[in-house]
A protein has these predicted regions:
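Conserved beta-strand-loop-alpha-helix hinge in the C-terminal portion
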Residues: 211-231
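Short beta->alpha linker loops
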Residues: 69, 191, 215, 233, ...
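Generic structural signal for secondary-structure transition and capping sites
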Residues: 33, 154, 182-185, 225, ...
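Short, charged/small-residue-rich alpha-helical element at the C-terminal edge
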Residues: 225-305
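ABC transporter nucleotide-binding domains
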Residues: 4-6, 13-24, 28-207, 212-213
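ABC-family P-loop ATPase nucleotide-binding domain
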Residues: 1-12, 308-319
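Hydrophobic aliphatic residues
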Residues: 101, 177, 181, 221-224, ...
Length: 319
């Protein structure tokens, strides 16, 4: 059995004159929580359609759970939340989920139990008998998430899963996704990069139909090779650190009074060792530390790689 839940190799897909995918490559390891990041029009929705078997590639290879993305082969093994999930307005939420369970091959009692289970996952058990047409937008989104988890599939694709949710239910959904690590493979497409950084193991950046970078979130954000220290007003210790601590680079951002330290980790000198050295020198110089963090945000890393469009305002708390 392959270790990859998703493997795309030089995949192309056109819709008339629109070249949605231009040789996209993607490897998603089994059991990971994986972030798919990119602007509108990057090809993320098309990629999801290929993974589900709703679309076929014009060129290249698509392999899902060790084989071709055939909807019959993937029945019960792949669940998906489209960005705009639609429900039958005149049937109850329970009836909708039981119907989908029956389509997966469940017998009626099993489908009933699964509907009850997944509604509990998204805190909608008390609305099981309400007509879908009477639900709020956020409740419809949560039913869509429940639908994706129906039958405990091996692979789940979630397109903007927390969009439209109130803060408590968004928090609960993030916790639900994190809890599946190692049990199911979940791919999350979202514009909320701070959220993706908090829940995902690996990520891929897409732009104009290609994957421009991918890897472990800790590697992309340089968690093991970079850190920042924000200082209270006082002398700038830049030259002191450059002369006393062995690093690859030390830069000073005066407007935010932030030192950014980059280094090459070795088995005998890891991030925590370099952080301790820098803090020792800062303390000896009388500098006062306000904040400390490892790496840079996923948003910063993405913006470094992406083609500039309009000026972006960071929403993360890192200085």
């Amino acid at each position: 059995m392959t270790d990859l839940a998703i493997h795309l190799d030089q995949v192309h897909k056109r819709f008339g004159n629109v070249h949605a995918l231009r040789g996209a490559d993607l490897k998603v390891p089994r059991g990971t929580i994986f972030a798919l990041i990119g602007p509108n029009g990057a090809g993320k929705t098309t990629l999801f359609g290929l993974c589900c078997g709703f679309l076929g590639p014009d060129r290249g290879r698509v392999e899902i759970l060790g084989g071709a993305p055939d909807p019959v082969r993937l029945k019960g093994r792949l669940g998906a939340l489209p960005q705009d999930a639609l429900l039958g307005r005149d049937i109850s939420v329970r009836e909708h989920l039981v119907f989908l369970g029956r389509l997966q091959g469940m017998d009626p009692p099993t489908a009933e139990r699964e509907a009850t289970r997944v509604l509990g996952l998204v805190d909608l058990a008390d609305l099981a008998d309400r007509r879908a047409g009477a639900l709020s937008h956020g409740q419809v989104k949560r039913v869509g998430v429940a639908q994706a988890f129906l039958g405990a599939p091996d692979l789940i694709l979630l397109d903007e899963p927390t969009a439209g949710l109130d803060p408590r239910h968004a928090h609960d959904l993030r916790a639900l996704i994190r809890a599946q690590r190692g049990q199911q493979t979940i791919v999350v497409s979202s514009h909320n990069l701070q959220e993706l950084e908090a829940i995902c193991d690996e990520a891929a950046f897409m732009e104009k139909g290609v994957t421009i970078e991918s890897g472990a979130v800790a590697t992309l954000t340089a968690q093991d090779a970079e850190f920042f220290v924000q200082l209270a007003p006082g002398p700038e210790p830049l030259e002191l650190l450059r002369s006393r601590v062995v690093t690859t680079a030390v830069t000073w951002e005066p407007e935010r009074r932030t030192l950014r330290v980059r280094f090459q980790p070795t088995p005998g000198r890891v991030a925590e060792d370099v952080i301790a050295e820098v803090l020792r020198e800062l303390r000896a110089s009388g500098a006062r530390v306000c904040a400390l963090g490892k790496g840079r945000s996923l948003e910063q890393r993405y913006l470094e790689q992406a083609t500039p469009s309009v000026p972006a305002t960071s929403s993360v708390s890192e200085p």
